[in-house]
Regions:
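Accessory nucleic acid-recognition modules appended to NTPase machines
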Residues: 116-288
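Active-site ExK catalytic segment of metal-dependent nucleases
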Residues: 283-299, 306
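Basic, amphipathic alpha-helical patches used to engage nucleic acids or provide basic targeting signals
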Residues: 297-326
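Conserved P-loop NTPase "ATPase switch" module shared by AAA+ and STAND
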Residues: 1-34
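Domain-level recognition of nuclease-like catalytic cores that cleave nucleotide substrates
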Residues: 325-349
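Short, polar loop motifs at secondary-structure junctions
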Residues: 57-61, 322-329
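Sensor-1/coupling segment of RecA-like P-loop NTPase cores
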Residues: 29-34, 43-66, 191
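Interdomain motor-coupling "hinge/lid" segment immediately C-terminal to the ATP-binding subdomain
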Residues: 48-49, 57-161, 165
Length: 349
C-alpha cells in the first residue's frame, strides 16, 4: 500500500500520553518524554506492506535534517522541476520553440500548464511565498534587504565565476554599504539548502583535481531565475549554460567548470600565464565530456573563442560545442563535435 504524508512535519509534538492520563498535551521546550512527527513516521514505517513517502516544506526540514532525524531509516529522494526532455515530451511541437519557452519559464509543472502571463505571476509568487519564505522561516531570519540583494546578484551573475569576496564587492557597489564574506557564504548556503541554486566547482583539467574558491552558480529552474529579475530579457548564453548544466545533473553526471593554465606570449613578447576555461567537464562512469555552450558560432571570432581551449587540450576526452541553433551533429576539421542544443539534450546525453 502506498502512503503519502504531506507537511506532517508541521504538526506539533505532544507529551507522551502515558504520562498525561491519555490526554494530548502540547510539548514544551525541554520536555523529554515527547512524541513528534518523526516518531509517527517511524511507527508507520514498521507496519507491513506500507510504502511510505513524506513530503513537505523546506521551512521545517531540509534534506540534511532527514539524515540526522531518521539516520539510516529513510532514503532522501531528490525531486526537481521538469527537465527539458520531460518538458518537451509534454508540450511537443517544434523543439526550437519549446526551448525558447523553456529558457524563459523553466519546468515547474504547474507553470507549464498556464498561459504565459499567468506563468510570470505564478513563478514570481512561487519564489516569494515558497522559496524565500522557507529560507526566512527555517533560519529564523527577518526579511532583509541584504538577503534580497544577494539573491538579485546571484541571479544576475548566474554562470559567472564567483566567490564570497566578489559577491560582497558587488553588493558594496550596488548598495553603497558593506557586507562581510561570512554573511555572504551563509546566505549562499541558505539558497542551496532551499534548492534555489546549485554550484559547479572549478576542476583543473591537467592536474585532475578541484581547485580554488571560485565557482559558478546555476538556478535549479530558469523560470525562477527570470522571475527573480522580473523577466528582464536574459543573457542567452547564461541561460543556455543553465539549461545544459541542469540537464546533465538530471541525467546523473558530475559537472565541474573545466580550467587549465598555459604559458603564452603577450604582445610585448613576454611570457605570461593564462587560465583557460571550458564551460563544463561532465563525467558519468566511463563517459567524459568537455562541453562549450554558445548562442551562436557563425561569427569567426566567437567560433575561435569557443574552440581555443580544445586546441590546447591534448587528451582523449570527447569535445563538444553546443549551440542554440537547429544544426545537424557534425565534426569540424579539428575533430570537435558541433551539435544543436535540442539534439544534445534530447538525443545525445
Amino acid at each position: 500500500m502506498l502512503c503519502f504524508l504531506d507537511d506532517i512535519q508541521k504538526v506539533y509534538s505532544i507529551v507522551n500520553p502515558n504520562l498525561t492520563d491519555g490526554k494530548h498535551v502540547m510539548a514544551q521546550k525541554g520536555d523529554e518524554e515527547t512524541i513528534s512527527f518523526v516518531d509517527v513516521v517511524l511507527g508507520l514505517s514498521r507496519e507491513e506492506n506500507i510504502d511510505l513517502y513524506v513530503t513537505g516544506s523546506n521551512s521545517k526540514m531540509l534534506s540534511a535534517d532527514i539524515i540526522t532525524e531518521f539516520r539510516d531509516k529513510a532514503t532522501n529522494i531528490a525531486l526537481a522541476p521538469l527537465s527539458f526532455q520531460e518538458y518537451f515530451n509534454y508540450v511537443g511541437g517544434s523543439a526550437s520553440e519549446a526551448m525558447y519557452d523553456y529558457i524563459q519559464f523553466g519546468g515547474m509543472p504547474l507553470a507549464v500548464l498556464k498561459p504565459d502571463e499567468e506563468k510570470r505571476e505564478y513563478l514570481k509568487g512561487l519564489f516569494e511565498t515558497t522559496y524565500f519564505s522557507d529560507i526566512i522561516e527555517h533560519n529564523t531570519l527577518r526579511k532583509s534587504e541584504s538577503l534580497d540583494e544577494l539573491c538579485n546578484i546571484v541571479s544576475t551573475q548566474s554562470g559567472e565565476l564567483l566567490n564570497a569576496e566578489k559577491i560582497a564587492n558587488t553588493y558594496k557597489s550596488v548598495k553603497k554599504e558593506k557586507i562581510d564574506k561570512q554573511t555572504v557564504e551563509k546566505y549562499l548556503g541558505y539558497f542551496k539548502d532551499a534548492f534555489i541554486i546549485r554550484e559547479a566547482k572549478r576542476y583543473d583539467l591537467k592536474g585532475r583535481n578541484e581547485i580554488g574558491a571560485l565557482r559558478k552558480y546555476y538556478f535549479i529552474d530558469t523560470g525562477l531565475r527570470n522571475a527573480r529579475l522580473n523577466f528582464a530579457f536574459p543573457d542567452e548564453g547564461q541561460m543556455l549554460e543553465n539549461v545544459v548544466f541542469n540537464e546533465l545533473v538530471y541525467k546523473g553526471y558530475s559537472v565541474n567548470v573545466g580550467c587549465f593554465d598555459t604559458v603564452e606570449k603577450n604582445k610585448n613578447g613576454n611570457s605570461i600565464r593564462k587560465t583557460n576555461e571550458v564551460d563544463f567537464y561532465a563525467t558519468k562512469g566511463i563517459r567524459k565530456y568537455y562541453i562549450q555552450v554558445s548562442a551562436d558560432i557563425s561569427n569567426a571570432e566567437a567560433r575561435a573563442r569557443e574552440i581555443k581551449p580544445y586546441l590546447l587540450l591534448n587528451d582523449e576526452v570527447t569535445k563538444l560545442v553546443v549551440i542554440n541553433r537547429p544544426v545537424k551533429e557534425s565534426l569540424d576539421e579539428n575533430g570537435f563535435t558541433i551539435i544543436g542544443i535540442t539534439d544534445f539534450l534530447l538525443k545525445y546525453i
